[in-house]
Amino acid sequence: MVEAIATKADAGVRQIYADLLSQAITGELVGMRNYAALVGLMPDVGSQIAVMHHASAELRHAENFGSVARTCGLEPIVNPDARHWRRVRNAFVRHAEHGDLTACLIIQEIMLEAMAVALYSELGALPDERIARIFAATAREEADHVSDGLDHLARAAQRDPAEFADKVEAIHDEVMVAIADMLAGEEGPSEHCGLCAGSCVKQALPELGLDRSRLRGRAMRQYLEALDALGVPGERSLAWVARLPI
């Protein structure tokens, strides 16, 4: 049964919710594709099964977001080839085609999953409790993915810390720039993300009690904490984040 967001909410507020769900659904589907692509890079059946479980979890998250959208009478846009997500996905595919498992895990389990945990945790406090519950529950599940990623990557970091940090920096400059662009200032018509139904949703976030700078700050803290856990020197990772779009 459809239970639309309270009638007192105007069309603009409803569209903000729809735009947020558009990003969430699309991001989960990109994650699903990424995890599925890892099967051919995994060294044994056990790890192949594990990444397929992760792919299934990402699909389930996307379906949960889609379900709550329908319940609330919202119509999100689903487009894994949207502008920023396409950049992230293309980078992942390039590394997968070169057989670079470490690079792929850095992108998916450190960069993307860390962003998901941070942003979904913030969106877990949205005014609409139905949507907030889905974001909060998904944040908790995504945190487990981050833990798995750290376990896999810790060995690579320990083998050659300097080489590992260099690899992260190179990937940071292609993938984290795309992610940061999603959280940066308002986009003009020529830079439309392809997921907002109208103008850029970011400037409308205060209508739901959200602050773009806070969202970005929490996302970057989560990312830096993940890198710190892998032994990446803080002076390096802080310099990388400092040069991202704001």
Each language-model region and where it sits:
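Non-heme di-metal
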Residues: 1-246
